[in-house]
Amino acid sequence: MIVAQVFFEDINNEKNKEAFKNYLRGKDLMFVGVGTTKAYLDSCGPKICSKLKRDNLTVFGTEEDQFHGANIERKINVLNDVYKNKFKIAIDSCVSEAKEINSIILDNEGLKPGAGMNKIFPRVGDFSLKIVMSDSADEIIKYTTTSSCEVNELKKVFDRVDRAVQKTYTFIMMCLRELENEMKLKKWS
């Protein structure tokens, strides 16, 4: 079920941050990046998890060790066995309506990878952050092979993905820092 939708220009909205933090409080967290850098519009999950890994957070599915449709059935068992006690937050790019592009959909039911491409894979995570990158699965496929694309067109796509990664990463880190500060205040009171 969708808990909140956060548009990039509104990541500081207290109501949206609180909706996310409510699911994080008191949990042993990890982040799961779903997607591939071979399809640039589908690369948000591994790119964000690579950034979170540099902040020493527990992650699965980075740019260096991707978690995507070609390996999900093999790797999901590792994820669920090794990290069975973690609260898994799945992060993936997704396809939705045009009016939802440049937003993050917070969902408390985990993630159904490949749904936008009509593929059926096992559900991933306990909670998900779905980054709306396009309103068309065809656009995702178009940027899988870049040989037919103009350089200027590719640059725009790269900029879109970079912005989505930065905004989502910022939203996650703001919420985690606020939770950390709440814990410190409780400890001192």
Label the model's feature ranges.
Residues 1-189:
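N-terminal catalytic or cofactor-binding beta/alpha core of small enzyme domains
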